């Protein structure tokens, strides 16, 4: 399973660990992904999504119905 938010599309990015001696080693910054069940009142069921913390805020702001419509328009099975 990929580490990508279903709502925002955020995925891992790369960067450096930097030591006190300023040595640089490559690392990955992973998104804060959570499996979360959202109640969809219009469908009378729960929908389980893998979303980042920002994705949850987007759903709170815009509503789960709007976000699900966009996911389905993109071709994601929900």
From Swiss-Prot:
Family of this protein: Belongs to the bacterial ribosomal protein bL28 family.
Pfam family, one: Ribosomal_L28
Domain of life per record: Bacteria
GO molecular function: structural constituent of ribosome
GO cellular component labels: cytosolic large ribosomal subunit
Keyword vocabulary terms for this entry: Ribonucleoprotein, Ribosomal protein
Protein name listed in UniProt: Large ribosomal subunit protein bL28
Organism of this sequence: Stutzerimonas stutzeri (strain A1501) (Pseudomonas stutzeri)
GO biological process: translation
InterPro entries: Ribosomal_bL28, Ribosomal_bL28/bL31-like_sf, Ribosomal_bL28_bact-type, Ribosomal_bL28_sf
Alphabetized NCBIfam families for the sequence: L28
The keyword Membrane appears for this protein: no
Keyword match Ribosomal protein: yes
Region feature Disordered, mapped onto this chain: 1-20
């Amino acid at each position: 399973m990929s580490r990508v938010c279903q709502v925002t599309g955020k995925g891992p990015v790369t960067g450096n660990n930097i030591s006190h001696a300023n040595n640089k080693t490559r690392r990955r910054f992973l998104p804060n992904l959570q499996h979360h069940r959202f109640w969809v009142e219009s469908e009378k069921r729960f929908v389980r999504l893998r979303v980042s913390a920002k994705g949850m805020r987007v759903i709170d702001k815009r509503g789960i119905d709007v976000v699900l419509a966009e996911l389905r328009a993109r071709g994601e099975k929900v």
